[in-house]
């Protein structure tokens, strides 16, 4: 049986979105992504508790921030043993509005990986797609530090990231879907509003088309999926990062997966170029209620999970 996952891999680079690296081997992803919430979830499992305890023990007396950085690198290093490609490691979301500290943290993370014998070409630094985060990426990219721009919900964010030369963006499909579904309430009709009409799917399709039309090299990696249909509707996207439970569903399915996105088709589009100077960026983002709310919410959630992780570490010291 040719699985839906195998078919998807013909068109798209499949990435595993997890801190639970023991699940990686069975799905054979090219890359992997992590975030503070996924690492927090992983260290609460018995299988990964020793990594947390060893990291705390090895760096006793150091600050909690120092220990968290080493914990992220410990997970990233283990993940890279199991995949041929890259791992994404996230800068603390509490730095989302501080360009210089984001730059400093990105440099520090890369130095830690290089000290562990891992080349910077195998690491993507995840930054929130705020104006400040995008400016940090612009500097880091010039230094050969590749960036993955996360918490991305709008075309203006995507356009600004591409102009800054970011290596990759992660537009969030599922969180966009969540927002619109909540707005429509009882009027939401999955059969009519989902699938190809899913607002999250349409957002990624529009961003992908914009990039290919204007010849940007920045990679598009759809993220934050709720259903396999959201994934298959984006077959052909440069990359898709998928949680283990949805990877399993694709692995178990024999559904036919057809290519939905292609560079050639996108190049024939007639989208207008987006203005991305700072004032235009801030106005357009502010004018998009969904993107504004979801960006703020995402930063709050990742920041809260970073605090929870700090408390776990403090409890072990």
Swiss-Prot record:
Transmembrane segments: none annotated. One of its GO terms (cellular component) is cytoplasm. It is an enzyme of class 2 (transferase). It comes from the Bacteria. It is found in: Cytoplasm. One of its GO terms (molecular function) is transaldolase activity. Its EC number is 2.2.1.2. It catalyses: D-sedoheptulose 7-phosphate + D-glyceraldehyde 3-phosphate = D-erythrose 4-phosphate + beta-D-fructose 6-phosphate. GO terms for biological process: carbohydrate metabolic process; pentose-phosphate shunt, non-oxidative branch. Keywords: Cytoplasm, Pentose shunt, Schiff base, Transferase. Signal peptide: none annotated. The active site is at residue 126. CDD domains: Transaldolase_TalAB. Disulfide bonds: none annotated. Pathway: Carbohydrate degradation; pentose phosphate pathway; D-glyceraldehyde 3-phosphate and beta-D-fructose 6-phosphate from D-ribose 5-phosphate and D-xylulose 5-phosphate (non-oxidative stage): step 2/3. Its main location: cytoplasm. Belongs to the transaldolase family. Type 1 subfamily. HAMAP family: Transaldolase_1. Transaldolase is important for the balance of metabolites in the pentose-phosphate pathway. Homodimer. This is Transaldolase.
């Amino acid at each position: 049986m040719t699985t839906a996952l195998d078919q998807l891999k013909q068109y798209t680079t499949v990435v595993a979105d997890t801190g639970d690296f023991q699940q990686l081997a069975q799905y054979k992803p090219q890359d992997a992504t992590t975030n503070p919430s996924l690492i927090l979830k992983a260290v609460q499992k018995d299988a990964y508790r020793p990594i947390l305890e060893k990291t705390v023990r090895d760096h006793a007396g150091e600050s909690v921030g120092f220990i968290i950085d080493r914990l992220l690198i410990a997970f990233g290093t283990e993940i890279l043993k199991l995949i041929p490609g890259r791992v994404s490691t996230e800068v603390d979301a509490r730095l989302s509005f501080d360009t210089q500290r984001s730059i400093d943290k990105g440099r520090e993370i890369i130095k830690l990986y290089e000290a562990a014998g891992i080349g910077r070409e195998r690491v993507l630094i995840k930054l929130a797609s705020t104006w400040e985060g995008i400016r940090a990426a612009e500097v880091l990219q010039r230094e050969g530090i590749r960036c993955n721009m996360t918490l991305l919900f709008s075309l203006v964010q995507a356009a600004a990231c591409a102009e800054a030369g970011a290596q990759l963006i992660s537009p969030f499909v599922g969180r966009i879907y969540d927002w619109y579904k909540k707005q429509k309430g009882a009027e939401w009709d999955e059969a009519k509003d989902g699938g190809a009409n899913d607002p999250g799917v349409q957002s990624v399709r529009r961003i992908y088309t914009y990039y290919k039309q204007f010849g940007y090299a920045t990679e598009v990696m759809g993220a934050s999926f709720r259903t396999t249909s959201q994934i298959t509707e984006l077959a052909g996207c440069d990359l898709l990062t998928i949680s283990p439970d949805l990877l399993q569903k694709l692995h178990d399915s024999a559904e036919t997966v057809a290519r939905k996105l292609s560079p050639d088709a996108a190049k024939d589009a007639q989208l207008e170029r987006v203005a991305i100077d700072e004032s235009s960026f801030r106005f357009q983002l502010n004018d998009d209620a969904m993107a504004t709310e979801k960006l703020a919410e995402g930063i709050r959630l990742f920041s809260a999970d970073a605090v929870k992780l700090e408390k776990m570490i403090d409890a072990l010291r």
